[in-house]
Amino acid sequence: MLGAYLPILVLVVIAVLFGLGSVIFSSLIGQKKPSTVKLAPYECGCEPVGSARERFSIKFYLIAMLFILFDIEAVFLYPWAVLFKRLGMFGLIEMGVFIVILFVGYVYVWKKGALEWE
């Protein structure tokens, strides 16, 4: 049974070896002459504005965490939608409870003002 996964394992091993080999090979034969231009932060070909070590507002992290939360919701809803007929009423109730819990969390975040950008 595990033999069916052997080609995937071989592909993963080859991909990891190729990635590591590329990094090691380039570090061995590449030039190692740092300069101020090479050490400067890169901003899409434009001149850097301000410091690259500037601190981000906590709001960015909050939005990222909320995105991950609702992205996980989509990950759980997709298989449920595919297997809807096979799961029957149990699956419908189970997903209903899941969506209600997420909706309560969304309302909580909304009431706390986490979605307001000021």
Swiss-Prot record:
The keyword Cell membrane applies. Its EC number is 7.1.1.-. The chain crosses the membrane at residues 5-25, 62-82, 87-107. The keyword DNA-binding does not apply. Signal peptide: none annotated. It is a multi-pass membrane protein. NDH-1 shuttles electrons from NADH, via FMN and iron-sulfur (Fe-S) centers, to quinones in the respiratory chain. The immediate electron acceptor for the enzyme in this species is believed to be ubiquinone. Couples the redox reaction to proton translocation (for every two electrons transferred, four hydrogen ions are translocated across the cytoplasmic membrane), and thus conserves the redox energy in a proton gradient. NDH-1 is composed of 14 different subunits. Subunits NuoA, H, J, K, L, M, N constitute the membrane sector of the complex. This is NADH-quinone oxidoreductase subunit A 2.
